């Protein structure tokens, strides 16, 4: 009995493990079909995979327990062999009967379970009830006897049979028992280790499967909710599309009616226009004179009104019709494409999910078949599935956002269509209101255009007269004029000098001051009396020290106008070193910069009269009777040869190997002036620390052409900053500075000789041609056509208010007086 109880304990222990596994699996099987009923087809597939996984683990555990059960059965058979020998036939019959009754039940159970798994795919709730009944049958089988020994014991007890074993049988049983006991202890230890190992593996498999199950359930819930939302949105989109189609049909009918109306209206307008044009022909000719004194702005306003009316009557209606049709067709096509795209993406998402589910099933099967896979590999698969699931969720969010955007676009398009329909109605009203005035406006515009053409022709004729009168005025003022400008005291000189002690301006308050008095040193007469020796000078204009560059430019702007009109003009700045010549000519607000600004501003007004001008310029320097190009520093170092050429027909002067720049903008001129100023020859003398040792000549070529009258004018503006004149005794120049000073004084003397010769030639009564010594200096030869026949010349004599420079100031004023006394007669007007 002790042996029998021991074996029963071992057998019952094995069956207890199997029963625990079955109980656990049974609870899962009972719980799972109830949830399958509440989910869709994808949920059923995921649950089916999990059931297969658990059932296979159950089979694995059953195999382990089966091995133990076979071992225990063998031991029990050895122990109970004497007991069962007398009833062997009854035992075999009972076993066969039990197998016959138990095996069919087990087969039915398996078939029923398979049927339940397959039926869940079709959402049938009655199969869930059948699954529940099958599980009850499994529990009933668990409550039955677990092994053959129990069956035999129950059979013997029910029959009341009891038999004692013989001594031989007892010895055999004891010896067999001892042998089997030692063998079974080893086997039990081995099976115990294997059982523990399999239990750990099974536990890990269950944990992983439970985790995967939770993730799949969450995924199913999210996907089902997103899919239901997508279906609702798709249904709403279809309803909106139907409404849009209905509105499209309505708008199409309205478009046809509008086209017929437009065609009739256009035909009637054309007929009316032709009739009215003929009837008003005679009336227009009689009323031309009555509109001669109307203002020019009426023509422009009426032209704009006609353009608006014509555009509103013709092009805008057609354009809006085309836009309406294009918008309707495009909107319908977009709605169809969007709906088809959403349906296609939904189908594609479902297919991808099904494909992914099938892949997961295959992965689970492979995972179950290959038990050697590690836990890390399984977790990697789960993570990859999560990533793919997140991607799908992101795609669903993107589709939802697209759908919302399309709804917003549809709403905005509908509003635009309503606005367009209202606008078309307003256009039709305007067309009806403005149709009557169109013919009158057109006739009036034609009259004003003819009047405008007449006025433009008169304006061109007046422009020619203006140029002639302007030139006559300049010739009356004198083709050679002299302006005197006195520079103010510097801050360092104010405490030491006083302007009133040196210079006086007797007609300072006059409209155009022209007199200047230079106060000399005291002189003692032969009788012993002392008196002030003053020198009075008179020029075309005298500028006091407080005069700025803008007031000076006002006086020379008329000469700039002559250059634009096609004459050669030269403006000189003459004076001793430090008298303000460079400030007058080349400063930021000097005569060169202000002349360029004035020219550009005036050319913009001439452009309205049909004139097109081209400006070109060059900047030269004459140093020691050698010409240099200030715009090309590299060539200055090479010192190329610059020959001067004169064109007698064009009365233009050109220089070889010199850079000529096209001036399209003002900034180009200012950049050129800065570059030229950096390359100029400057040296220090006793008279001035930074004395200009050369003459600079800025030559601006002004070429204009009128596209309507075919008139051409070519003028040249020369702005010259002469080198400072110095007395050798005062400057104390030696060496190179001495040669520079001598060359400067020589060229200035040649300039005076040329001007004096021009005056003599103009006043000569003989018919012989007087000689003008242009070739005595590079400066005078370069400015040949800007000093002589038909040219306008202005010389600034810049003087210093310092008493220490009295003699230099006196010499400069005497030279300027010599130039001012030169009178050049009126020259015939040359066509340009």
UniProtKB/Swiss-Prot annotation:
One of its GO terms (biological process) is microtubule anchoring at mitotic spindle pole body. One of its GO terms (molecular function) is microtubule binding. It holds the Pfam family Kinesin. SMART domains: KISc (SM00129). Belongs to the TRAFAC class myosin-kinesin ATPase superfamily. Kinesin family. NCD subfamily. Microtubule-dependent motor that is involved in microtubule organization in the mitotic spindle. This is Kinesin-like protein 1. It comes from Schizosaccharomyces pombe (strain 972 / ATCC 24843) (Fission yeast). The lineage of its organism: Eukaryota, Fungi, Dikarya, Ascomycota, Taphrinomycotina. The gene is klp1.
